[in-house]
Design a protein with these regions (language model features):
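Iron-sulfur (Fe-S) cluster-binding modules
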Residues: 1-175
């Protein structure tokens, strides 16, 4: 899709997908861009006491409660809390790898035990801050894709091709 936006770059860090999506959701609901850093509260923070990060934002008069979990153990805690109805969120991001893709198995290893995901994530957010485009919806290639093929965001064609449905599977007990 050609040159990307800073919002696309931060997909690799925990909280980045949520932040990028909220930027565009704000635009789609208000017709105006927010401050590019308006949703940075969803970014993962080091040494958090809770297994996930949460925040609430106003989008055109509707409060959106968000949660971001990094690592499958933390995701398990979040999912349990949701199932127990201890918490409620309209929007959840789960990154399987600690720190997001920046901490994933495809990253270089230097032989030390030092975790580099947090440092890599900070670099991604810095790249976003310095990017000429900071919003996914302003990416010219994405705009052309919608204009020439998908019609508009949330159109029937876009929903059909870009979104998926999840269904619970009933599995037989282990034998």
């Amino acid at each position: 899709l050609g040159n990307g936006s800073g919002a696309g770059v931060i997909f690799g860090a925990t909280g980045g997908v949520m932040e990028a999506a909220l930027r565009s959701a704000y635009f789609l609901t208000t017709g105006e861009n927010p401050s590019a850093d308006a949703f940075c509260e969803v970014r993962a923070a080091e040494n958090e006491s809770r297994p996930w990060r949460e925040a609430a934002f106003d989008l055109a008069g509707t409060t959106i409660h968000c949660a971001v979990a990094s690592g499958l153990a933390n995701a398990r805690h979040l999912i349990r809390a949701i199932k127990r109805r201890e918490v409620h969120y309209e929007f959840v991001e789960i990154m399987a790898c600690p720190g997001g893709c920046a901490g994933g198995g495809g990253q270089p290893v230097d032989g030390t035990d030092r975790e580099k995901a947090a440092d890599r994530g900070k670099v991604l957010f810095r790249l976003d801050q310095n990017a000429p485009l900071r919003f996914s919806h302003e990416n010219p290639a994405v705009q052309a894709l919608y204009r020439e093929y998908l019609d508009e965001p949330c159109s029937h064609r876009a929903e059909e091709l870009l979104h998926c449905d999840h269904f619970a599977l009933q599995m037989d007990a282990a034998r």
